[in-house]
Structures are given as structure tokens and as C-alpha cells.
From Swiss-Prot:
Organism of origin: Homo sapiens
Its EC number(s): 3.5.2.6
Protein name in UniProt: DNA cross-link repair 1A protein
MF annotations from Gene Ontology: 5'-3' DNA exonuclease activity; beta-lactamase activity; damaged DNA binding; zinc ion binding
Family to which this protein belongs: Belongs to the DNA repair metallo-beta-lactamase (DRMBL) family.
Gene name of the encoded protein: DCLRE1A
Induction cue: During mitosis. The mRNA encoding this protein contains an internal ribosome entry site (IRES) in its 5'-UTR. This 5'-UTR generally suppresses translation while specifically promoting expression during mitosis, when cap-dependent translation may be impaired.
Task performed by this protein: May be required for DNA interstrand cross-link repair. Also required for checkpoint mediated cell cycle arrest in early prophase in response to mitotic spindle poisons. Possesses beta-lactamase activity, catalyzing the hydrolysis of penicillin G and nitrocefin. Exhibits no activity towards other beta-lactam antibiotic classes including cephalosporins (cefotaxime) and carbapenems (imipenem).
GO BP field: cell division; double-strand break repair via nonhomologous end joining; interstrand cross-link repair
High-level lineage: Eukaryota, Metazoa, Chordata, Craniata, Vertebrata
Subcellular location: Nucleus
Keyword Nucleus set for record: yes
Length: 1040
């Protein structure tokens, strides 16, 4: 229970590990079997949840039933004629393991002194996970994918390799072994009522071996050209070529069935595990045996690791869904009968006929691929874009000599944004076959958290493809105004002898989309989006019926997202590409998902296979020409979001491309990114953001940084170009206030003289935009009288007093330390209507002493230490600027200069304060007081610094001045006790540059403002309401 609570607190989701109770009469029969298989004499983790994970992994391997087929697929060897309902009951019984019986096995199989032994094999190198030492399977696969292959030599043992030495799998490749393991898969044959349709299957293809494929290209091409069928996998009990090539399982459905193919892309090769189609023009009609597919076990990577397990009562995960659009010309139409399967014909190019003459029927098939570890991973397609051949033939980006047909691969991000749809072909001629996309009532669709294939709404694809192909492939497409019209391909450009049946398929790129929801693109925007150059052949004659996925959501452990992260791929760039280099699709978490907050790319350069390829997007629509140099453009990513979620709020940003309709808004955002914002990547800051505006997540400047009635903002540089802002004020030079300022900033900045020097010398802001104002002097800025007052915070820190034309007086304190001396400043007789208050320590627990008292304590302590030990070194911790009063006072008493780094020395020189310049030096060996960064004031850092002094000092007395040290711990400075370790003592002195609670209270009650607006710790309603309560109490006490 504690574990569940901890996970919920950390990851913000409820653990799903606790299994659901089921009827003992239904589930108990298979429980012992599940537990026995989970353990099987091997060590499982001593926690019950780990045993349940292992049981689930075994369950999924033993019962390879896709989620979509769970209630409808039957085993040929056992119950081919069994009903759909029986299949559902059997699946649920096998996959449900009550927690009670699982716990009873704990004492029998737990051996905490034995290292865990994992089942399965690495989907990339094929090393058995049982050989892992000190690694989990997930860890190993992650490293295996990231590390480049060391060898291209195939293992001499081939299929018989049983090595358990990890280095062996680095020394040799194991392509044949991977292929063999992928092929050992249970299948069921088609039902006589299938009408020649193929149904869902679970691919055994485990890994995308891009690097290893090259050594097998010639062999594959030769075997394909000689054999009538394409064989890419081995089957133990499937002697005929027809059986071996089809890797298809029958999906027994109530009314309709779907055709599915399993393909695999390796090194720019698209290999169909469908039928090899002859090059002649004859129809191929091969009978599909009903009971010949073998019922073999499948060997691949474990589906659940020790850190990633779902409820046992949930069905095993279906893998990636594919939608095939099968285009057949008039001559190459699909034929079907009760006993045979329709096959595609092999052509080298599509015969483009007139629309009226031949309207090819596109038969849509919803398919799924089981644990397709590397299938269609776009990082393996490094050169997808190819120009159109000069002989006017439509060329694909792959060498399709070894395929069973010409396949057109939609980019996954493009397909992923389209609505989930099931397409049906229309009957135009009675002699042409028609396949209906089948999806029975009991069949479940799952939108995976990981990469899964897209079901595409064809009208959207149509609108996306028409205009781009008119411009890129002139004469290839003719746009039609309605959804029902069929696009025709020009017959002038292609050879009539090379007509083809082509299949277009798309990947589902939505991980974890909430059930029943689909992320779609605006049709109008898509119609003007240039399509990738490698989409050359379009399906024709399509209608669609949109359907929503069901509520079952499970994890997909495919190799690209084995760790909950989309796989990396190299980004393709075109010459002259704009600032937009990639658009990351961050999916919306589903309520049933685990790791909703873990599946995020850290590196912005890590583009997933769910992204658009930047080289396929038109520069004029996706970027705005900016004034700064190209190198700066390439360093930033401006992420666009145009995803519309049906009935759900987005918890994480969905970044999609929105083109012409929002170009103006994008221009506004990106101009500031270049000219004003500099190198700051605003997307990484956790700052309040507005809703989806202009296709980009634009940060919103909070109201407490705006001065009402003016065009002024205070310390608001990190929010981009603030609408209506005519002058930007900076209170002091601390990074949390000047964040966003850089040398590219081109708006007027008003600050103190010291802060202006720091901006010019440290941030290199152009001097023409820096407007220093004197202290205690009335100045006119854009018609508003402004006065800067000392804030007693750090050098150059100021409070800003605004006198609005309507008589309203506003005081913005910035960061300040209230002091009684302020009561004798220009505020003495001033009525303040609104007070923007620094509320850093607005809580009664912060009752630290005054600065003068702390400085006296530090002086006395340092003087005593140096007097007792002349070789003692005094060290003070500092930030970039601040805490100067402490070390300057100590150095003055000890009669020594303050030694510091060159960088710190330059910073203090910018202050132009004579008293400071006379007491600082970079010669550390000649001074008794040293300055170090605050983060180095610890025993390890100080010990290291002591060694650098070459033995001149044998003791360190360090001061860490910070107000946090004193929070709710001490009431007097005398109570401060040092931390001592050896010859190093560290004093955490309560020297703060922010007001304590009592100082703040005194200042407010003296100033008597009509309204107080807190500027710090305002992130939650609770903290704001608490401070409001304090303000009311202060007002009542003061009687105003």
C-alpha cells in the first residue's frame, strides 16, 4: 500500500499492479499453471508484484492473442469451430490471476540470494536475457539500441546458436536467429466464410536490424526473384510455400474480416511478409489451406520488466495497428472466393488510367502487428525522399524488387494526426471484388502509449495530398472537390505495361491518446501542407467510417518504445531549411496508462519516429523569416501545437503542425525568439503558459509583473514580447529576474546604473537599449513619472515608484529587505495605492535577525579564529552579486583583501564602487578572506579548496549567509552552531537580503497601502489565501 501511495505522489498516477478479483470457479483452473510458468524453477523477485510481472510475461507468450482478437480468434489445433464467446472466456480465464493464490506461491519460490534470471531474448542482438548480470532487460535493450553495431559478421552457428556469452552477441550478428524466432508463431487458418479475406495477425518481427540487412540484400533479392512467394520467416509445421509466405492468421468475426500484412523495413528495404506477386499480368489465385499453419511458440523480448507491469486481469497488449489501403487497377483486381485468398500482382509501376475507364477499388483493411519491435521505424529510413525518375515513372523511395507489391509509406506523424477511421470500398462494377474493412462488435481497438499504426481518415489525406502533388508531381494527380470522387492518376507519364496494385499503410502515432479520442488535423490546413516527396501513389475510390477505440488500453513493448520513449532518429534537413527543424508529438496521457509522465524525450534533438520530417515541409508555411543569423535559427526549436482533442483537455502539449491559418501568430512569437529573446529556450521553463495560441505554446506574462494603466512591465523578460508593453523595467541583476535578456534584446530596458553596467558587461545587451535611471530622482518614462529607490537587496537593486497620470501611486518593491531607514526616504509622506510586495518570507516562522547583527557576529567569529590561528582561512559564500556586506566587513576588520576568481573580480568591478575596488583581488595566496560560490560551501568543496592553497592554511572557517538557514530554527544569532568536520567549520548565518516576516509586517503597516499584490510564492491558491489572511491581519492591527 505504501508503494502505491508513493508512486501516486511521485508520478501522479495510480498504480495498476493490484490485480482484480475474479470468480474462483472461472479463474482458479488456470492460476496454478500461470504461476508455475512464471517461476518455472527460475528466480523471480521476492516481492509479489515482481512475480506477478513474470507471470504476465509468460501469460502473454503462452497466449499470443491480440487484444483486438481476444474474443474472436480461435486455435486451429484445438478449437477451430469454437464460438467467439468461448474464445473470450478462455482468454479471460488464462490471463486473470487472483492476487491471493499468487501470494501463496511466494514462500516456495523466493530465494533472495540468487540473482534474477530473465526470460526472453534481446530483440536487437538476440542475446538471451538469462545471461544478464546486473542489468534488467530494459536496461540492456536501451544500451543495445544506442550502441552502434561492432560487427557485420553473421554468427557461424546460425540458427543453432545457443551462446550465453554476452560478448558473442556483440562480435557477431544474429539475423537468421532473429528471423527464425520471429517466425515461430502460432497461427490459425482462415474460415471458409472469410471470403478470401485475411485477418489480424501478430507479427513476430522483433527487431529492426537496419545495420545488418545489407549483408542479406542480395540473398533476399535472389530468393524473391526465383520463388513465386516471398518467404521471410521460418515455420516449423508449414511445409508449403503458400503457408510459409503468408504469416497470416484468421480472425473469425461475426460479419466481416480484415486483410493484414506484416512488413518489415530494413535499410531502405520494404519487405512484405505477404505473397510475392509475379511480374506477369495474369491473376494469381492460390488456395489458402485451412489447417496448415503451425501452432508454434514465439520467442522475443519480454513484454514486461520488473519496473513495468500491468494488471493481470488486463488482456495482453495488441501491437501496432496498420491500415492498408489496397489499390488495384482494372487489370489487377483482387479476386476472391470462399476458399481462396486474393493476392496482389507484382508490378513495377502503376498503370494510370482515366477515371471513367477504370476506377480502382480501394479495399481498406484494419490490421495489427504483434510486438513489432522495429517495424517501419523511421530512423531506419534515412533517405526517404527521392526525386521522380526522369523516365516519367512513379518511383518509390525503396528498392521494391523483393516485395510482393509496391508499397507507399505515409510518414507516421502525418498519419498519426488523422482521425481513426475504417475505410470501405464502394462497388462501382459488379465484376470487381469488394473487401469490407472488418471489425466485429467484440473486437477491441487499442490506441497504444507507444508507437502504433495510424488509421487514416481518407478525406483528410485527400485534402493533404491533392495540392502538394499538383505542384510536385505535375500531371500525377487531379484534385476533386468532393470526398466521393476518385482521384485519377495521369496516364501520360507511366508505362502501361507496369500497372500495379499498391498498398498504402500508415502508422498510428498517438501514444496514450485517451479512449475514444483522436487527434486530427484541420482539413483546410492540411490541404495546403506540402506532402513528403516519397508519397508517390495514392489510393483511389475511398470512403471512410470513423470509429473510436474502445476503453482497453495496454502497453506496447515495441523496440522503438521499449522504455516508454519514442525511438530516436536522425533528422533529415534540406538546404535553406527554416528555424523549425522538427515537431515533437507529445501524446496526451490516457487514464489507463502507466508511466504517463515518464514517456518524454529529454533531448530536443531526439526526434521520434512520430515526428514530421522537416525536409518534407515547405519553408514558407512552417517558419517565419527572422532577422538574426541562420546559426541561431538552427539552435532553437519552436514547437507548434495544433492538435484538437475531442472531449478531453490536454495534460501535455500535443505538438502538431498548423500551417497557413496561423502563420501570422507564429511570426509574432518567433520574431521575439530571435530578436529579443536570444538563446533562451522558453519551452523548458515552467512558467505560466497560455492556451494554444498561434500554434505555439506562448508564455503569458502574469498580471503582477504588469503595471496597470501603463505600458510597463517589471522583471518580465522571460515571457516574450508582452503585448502592449512599451518599456521593460529591471529591478536588479539576479538571474530569476533578468531571465530572457540577451544581446539580442531590442526593447528599452530601464534600471539602475549599476544594473545597467552589469547588463552591458555580463549579458552584452546593446547599450542603446539600456536606459539607466538615477536613484531618488523623478524621471519621466513614456509620460509617467518614475522614481527609483534603494531596495537594500544587492548592489543596484531598486524599488520603483510609479506616479500614474490619473493620480494612482504604485510601488513595486522587486526583491527588497525592509529597513527602518526607508521610512526616511521619499516614501515618508507618500500615499501608496497599490503595493507589489516581495513576499519571499511572508510567514511568521521567518524571524531572523537584522543584517547588522549578523554582520557583527561574523566579524567577531572570524577575528577570534584568525587571532587564535594565524593560518586560518576565512571563506564566504556568494552568488553572482550579493552578500558583499559580509565579506567586506570581515576583510576590513582583518586588514586583508578579499581573494576571488577572475570572473567574480570582473563582476565586482562593474559595480564601480570605490570601497569595493580597494578591497578585492585575484591573488588568493595573499589574502585571508576568500570568496567561493555558494554551492561550494560544503566539506568536500572546502577541503578541495584547502588543498589548492598549497599548505599555506591549515584551517577553514566558512560562512554560508542565507536566510533559509534561520527559518523556524533560531531566535537569536548566538544560537547559531557551526558544522565541524576536521579542520573545517561552516557557519550558516541567517544573513538574508529579503525581508523577514516581522520586517515586512512593519513596512506594510507603516506604508499603509490600499491594496497589496504579492509577487513571490503565488503559485498555489493555498499560499495566496494564506498571505491574504496575513495582509488583513496587518491592516486590522494598524487600523487603516
Amino acid at each position: 500500500m505504501l508503494e502505491d501511495i508513493s508512486e501516486e505522489d511521485i508520478w501522479e498516477y495510480k498504480s495498476k499492479r493490484k490485480p482484480k478479483r475474479v470468480d474462483p470457479n472461472n479463474g482458479s483452473k488456470n492460476i496454478l499453471k500461470s504461476v508455475e510458468k512464471a517461476t518455472d524453477g527460475k528466480y523471480q523477485s521476492k516481492r509479489s508484484r515482481n512475480r506477478k510481472r513474470a507471470a504476465e510475461a509468460k501469460e502473454v507468450k503462452d497466449h499470443e492473442v491480440p487484444l483486438g482478437n481476444a474474443g474472436c480468434q480461435t486455435s486451429v489445433a484445438s478449437s477451430q469451430n469454437s464460438s467467439c464467446g468461448d474464445g473470450i472466456q478462455q482468454t479471460q480465464d488464462k490471463e486473470t490471476t487472483p492476487g491471493k493464490l499468487c501470494r501463496t506461491q511466494k514462500s516456495q519460490h523466493v530465494s533472495p540470494k540468487i540473482r534474477p534470471v530473465y526470460d526472453g531474448y534481446c530483440p536487437n542482438c538476440q542475446m538471451p536475457f538469462s545471461s544478464l548480470i546486473g542489468q534488467t532487460p530494459r536496461w540492456h535493450v536501451f544500451e543495445c539500441l544506442d550502441s552502434p553495431p561492432r560487427s557485420e559478421t553473421e554468427c557461424p552457428d546460425g540458427l543453432l546458436c545457443t551462446s550465453t556469452i554476452p560478448f558473442h552477441y556483440k562480435r557477431y550478428t544474429h539475423f537468421l536467429l532473429a528471423q527464425s524466432r520471429a517466425g515461430d508463431h502460432p497461427f490459425s487458418s482462415p474460415s471458409p466464410a472469410s471470403g478470401g479475406s485475411f485477418s489480424e495477425t501478430k507479427s513476430g518481427v522483433l527487431c529492426s536490424l537496419e545495420e545488418r540487412w545489407s549483408s542479406y540484400q542480395n540473398q533476399t533479392d535472389n530468393s524473391v526473384s526465383n520463388d513465386p512467394l516471398l518467404m521471410t520467416q521460418y515455420f516449423k509445421k508449414s511445409p508449403s510455400l503458400t503457408e510459409a509466405s503468408e504469416k497470416i492468421s484468421t480472425h473469425i468475426q461475426t460479419s466481416q474480416q480484415a486483410l493484414q500484412f506484416t512488413d518489415f523495413v530494413e535499410n531502405d528495404k520494404l519487405v512484405g511478409v505477404a505473397l510475392r506477386l509475379a511480374n506477369n499480368s495474369e491473376h494469381i489465385n492460390l488456395p489458402l489451406p485451412e489447417n496448415d499453419f503451425s501452432d508454434c511458440e514465439i520467442s522475443y523480448s519480454p513484454l514486461q520488466s520488473d519496473e513495468d507491469t500491468h494488471d493481470i486481469d488486463e488482456k495482453p497488449d495488441d501491437s501496432q495497428e496498420q491500415l492498408f489501403f489496397t489499390e488495384s487497377s482494372k487489370d489487377g483486381s483482387l479476386e476472391e472466393d470462399d476458399d481462396s485468398c486474393g493476392f496482389f500482382k507484382k508490378r513495377h509501376g502503376p498503370l494510370l488510367k482515366d477515371q471513367d475507364e477504370s476506377c480502382p477499388k480501394v479495399n481498406s483493411f484494419l490490421t495489427r502487428d504483434k510486438y513489432d519491435e522495429g517495424l517501419y521505424r523511421f530512423n531506419s529510413l534515412n533517405d526517404l525522399s527521392q526525386p521522380i525518375s526522369q523516365n516519367n515513372e512513379s518511383t518509390l523511395p525503396y528498392d521494391l524488387a523483393c516485395t510482393g507489391g509496391d508499397f507507399v509509406l505515409f510518414p507516421p506523424a502525418l498519419a498519426g494526426k488523422l482521425a481513426a477511421s475504417v475505410h470501405q470500398a464502394t462497388k462501382a462494377k459488379p465484376d470487381e471484388p469488394e473487401f469490407h474493412s472488418a471489425q466485429s462488435n467484440k473486437q477491441k481497438q487499442v490506441i497504444e502509449e507507444s508507437s502504433v499504426y495510424n488509421q487514416v481518415s481518407l478525406p483528410l489525406v485527400k485534402s493533404l495530398m491533392l495540392k502538394p502533388f499538383e505542384s510536385q508531381v505535375e500531371g500525377y494527380l487531379s484534385s476533386q472537390p468532393t470526398q466521393n470522387t476518385i482521384r485519377k492518376l495521369s496516364s501520360e507519364n507511366l508505362n502501361a505495361k507496369n500497372n500495379t496494385n499498391s498498398a498504402c499503410f500508415c502508422r498510428k502515432a498517438l501514444e496514450g491518446v485517451p479512449v475514444g479520442k483522436a487527434t486530427i488535423l484541420n482539413t483546410e490546413n492540411l490541404s495546403s501542407t506540402p506532402a513528403p516527396k516519397y508519397l508517390k501513389i495514392l489510393p483511389s475510390g475511398l470512403k471512410y467510417n470513423a470509429r473510436h477505440p474502445s476503453t482497453k488500453v495496454m502497453k506496447q513493448m515495441d523496440i522503438g518504445v521499449y522504455f516508454g520513449l519514442p525511438p530516436k532518429r536522425k533528422e533529415e534537413k534540406l538546404l535553406g531549411e527554416s528555424a523549425l527543424e522538427g515537431i515533437n508529438l507529445n501524446p496526451v496521457p490516457s487514464p489507463n496508462q502507466k508511466r504517463s509522465s515518464q514517456c518524454k524525450r529529454k533531448a530536443e534533438k531526439s526526434l521520434s519516429d512520430l515526428e514530421f520530417d522537416a525536409s518534407t515541409l515547405h519553408e514558407s508555411q512552417l517558419s517565419v523569416e527572422l532577422s538574426s543569423e541562420r546559426s541561431q535559427r538552427q539552435k532553437k526549436r519552436c514547437r507548434k501545437s495544433n492538435s484538437l482533442q475531442e472531449g478531453a483537455c490536454q495534460k501535455r502539449s500535443d505538438h502538431l503542425i498548423n500551417t497557413e491559418s496561423e502563420a501570422v501568430n507564429l511570426s509574432k512569437v518567433k520574431v521575439f525568439t530571435k530578436s529579443a529573446h536570444g538563446g533562451l529556450q522558453r519551452g523548458n521553463k515552467k512558467i505560466p503558459e497560455s492556451s494554444n495560441v498561434g500554434g505555439s505554446r506562448k508564455k503569458t506574462c502574469p498580471f503582477y509583473k504588469k503595471i496597470p494603466g501603463t505600458g510597463f512591465t517589471v522583471d518580465a523578460f522571460q515571457y516574450g514580447v508582452v503585448e502592449g508593453c512599451t518599456a521593460y523595467f529591471l529591478t536588479h541583476f539576479h538571474s530569476d529576474h533578468y531571465a530572457g535578456l540577451s544581446k539580442h534584446f531590442t526593447f528599452p530596458v530601464y534600471c539602475s546604473e549599476i544594473t545597467g553596467n552589469l547588463l552591458k558587461n555580463k549579458l552584452h545587451v546593446q547599450e542603446q537599449y539600456i536606459h539607466p535611471l538615477p536613484l531618488d530622482t523623478e524621471c519621466i518614462v513614456n509620460g509617467v513619472k518614475v522614481v527609483l529607490l534603494d531596495a537594500n537587496h544587492c548592489p543596484g537593486a531598486v524599488m520603483i515608484l510609479f506616479y500614474l497620470p490619473n493620480g494612482t501611486v504604485i510601488l513595486h518593491t522587486g526583491d527588497f529587505r525592509a529597513d527602518p531607514s526607508m521610512e526616511r526616504s521619499l516614501l515618508a509622506d507618500q500615499k501608496v495605492h497599490m503595493l507589489y510586495l516581495d513576499t519571499t518570507y511572508c510567514s511568521p516562522e521567518y524571524t531572523f535577525p537584522s543584517q547588522q547583527e549578523v554582520i557583527r557576529f561574523a566579524i567577531n567569529t572570524a577575528f577570534e579564529a584568525v587571532t587564535l590561528n594565524p593560518h586560518a582561512l576565512v571563506v564566504c559564500g556568494t552568488y553572482s552579486i550579493g552578500k558583499e556586506k559580509v565579506f567586506l566587513a570581515i576583510a576590513d576588520v582583518l586588514g586583508s583583501k578579499v581573494g576571488m576568481s577572475q570572473e567574480k573580480y570582473k563582476t565586482l568591478q562593474c559595480l564601480n564602487i570605490p570601497e569595493i575596488n580597494s578591497l578585492i583581488t585575484t591573488d588568493m595566496c595573499s589574502s585571508l578572506v576568500h570568496l567561493l560560490p555558494m554551492m561550494q560551501i560544503n566539506f568536500k568543496g572546502l577541503q578541495s579548496h584547502l588543498k589548492k592553497c598549497g599548505g599555506k592554511y591549515n584551517q577553514i572557517l566558512a560562512f554560508r549567509p542565507t536566510g533559509w538557514t534561520h527559518s523556524n530554527k533560531f531566535t537569536r544569532i548566538a544560537d547559531v552552531i557551526p558544522q565541524t568536520k576536521g579542520n573545517i567549520s561552516i557557519y550558516g548565518i541567517p544573513y538574508s537580503e529579503h525581508s523577514s516576516y516581522l520586517e515586512m509586517k512593519r513596512f506594510v503597516q507603516w506604508l499603509k497601502p490600499q491594496k497589496i499584490i504579492p509577487t513571490v510564492n503565488v503559485g498555489t491558491w493555498k499560499s495566496r489565501s494564506t498571505m491574504e489572511k496575513y495582509f488583513r491581519e496587518w491592516k486590522l492591527e494598524a487600523g487603516y
